[in-house]
Each structure stands twice: as structure tokens, then as C-alpha cells.
Amino acid sequence: MKKNEDKLPELKELAESRKELSPMIGNLEIISKEEVRKIIPSFDNNGDVLYASGGGRVEGERFVNTLLTASKVNVVREKVSLKVVGDKYEINGQVFDTVVLATGAWLKDILEPLGFDVDVRPQKGQLRDYKVSDENTGSYPVIMPEGELDIIPFEKGVVSVGATHENDMDFDLTVDKQQLDAFGEEAENFLGELKNAQIINERVGIRAYTSDYSPFFGEVPTLE
């Protein structure tokens, strides 16, 4: 969605250019509010929107738990450090040939003792889960207004609203209801059912960000 509808054709053109690498985007078309309401009855917006038939949504916690169960890995729930021992790596007394550093915002803390200055910082994100009366939300598409707000419908009337992008909060995991209330009020302008919805959960997490917002991946120099 765009505040200025005149920019929708440009957005559609950009999305079309990315379909070759991301065919999951599906078909793209600019549709009216009335057409959206055939898909989402309580949708409320005055202008046209760009609709993508593909894409998907993931409930992060369930996804992570599924991966952990399938991999059968031994999850260590404590702070660890990484040491280089010859051509191998030691973590909490265990030695490995190769280590994948999927540590998110904690990557800087892991590599700093080894002499690396890593351009990764923590960014706080909060979202709130609502329960609406419509039980058919599982077939609704994600609503993405311009800005930080996303409205993500799941099955059986559960709708997630978020997520905040809070800098300079370090690793603070406290819930800020004022921030979530503001997001909820904004979301009501796009999904009317949220006005009478029940709050069922609030979640806080830390995402990793770089100074130029680009993805950060690859082998660590000198540790290949």
C-alpha cells in the first residue's frame, strides 16, 4: 500500500522485476478497496492497493521449534564463547571443524574477543496478537501499509500487528504498551475488526541490523 496512489504502478513494476528470482511473489495487480473487501470483508482504506497473490507468512516461534525438533540438535541455553584452536573451533569445551554463526544481534559480542569489529547492532521489535470475531482469517493476505506497520492474519481469528523498529534500546526486552497501543490504533484504520478485538499476547524480540540495512553474511575473514 502507498499513501500516494500514483506510486503504485512504480511499486508494481519493481515487484515484477523481482519475480524472476522470487517467483513466489505470484501475480500482481492494482485493485480497488471494493475488490479487497471481497477478500477481507472488514478492510478499510480509501484508495487502491497493490495485491500479490503469492508470498507467505511464518509464525516465527513455531517455525524455530519445528526446525529444532527436526534437526535433533542439543540446544545449549547459556552464554557461550568462541575460541580458535589451531584450525578448529572450541565452544564450551567442545571442538568443531566448522561453526555457523547464526547469532543475530549477538554476532558482535561473539567475534569481538577474536579481534573483529562487526557492523551489527541490536534493534528492538515488538508486536501484539489480537483475536477477532472472524474465524476465516487464515485465508487473508498480509496487509502492508507504507511505514513500519504490518497486519498479519493467521488461522482462527488471530491477527498479529507490528513490528516496531526501535534503535538505541540495546537488548531491552520489556513490553512498551504505549508503542503497541499506537500501532494498534493505526492498524484499526485498515482492518476494522481490530476495534473490538481481544488482546491475547504481546511479544518482544531483538533483530540484527547493519548501518546500511544490508544483509550481513559470508565467511569470517582469516577464519575461513
Question: What are the residue ranges of the model-derived segments?
Answer:
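Dinucleotide-binding Rossmann-like beta1-alpha1 core, especially the glycine-rich loop
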Residues: M1-I39
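Glycine-rich nucleotide phosphate-binding loop and flanking beta-alpha elements
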Residues: K7-L8, V58, L82, W106-D109, ...
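A general structural signal for well-ordered alpha-helical segments in protein cores
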Residues: L8-A15, K33, G60-V64, L180-G184, ...
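Helix-loop-beta segment of a Rossmann-like dinucleotide-binding subdomain
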Residues: N27-A70, T164-M169, E224
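Short loop/edge segments at beta-strand edges and connector loops
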Residues: S32-K33, V75-K79, N201-R203
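A conserved short coil-to-beta-strand element within the FAD-binding core of flavoproteins
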Residues: G56, V75-E90
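Core beta-strand elements of the Rossmann-like FAD/NAD(P) dinucleotide-binding domain
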Residues: N92-T98
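Active-site substrate-recognition segment that forms the wall
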Residues: T103-L223
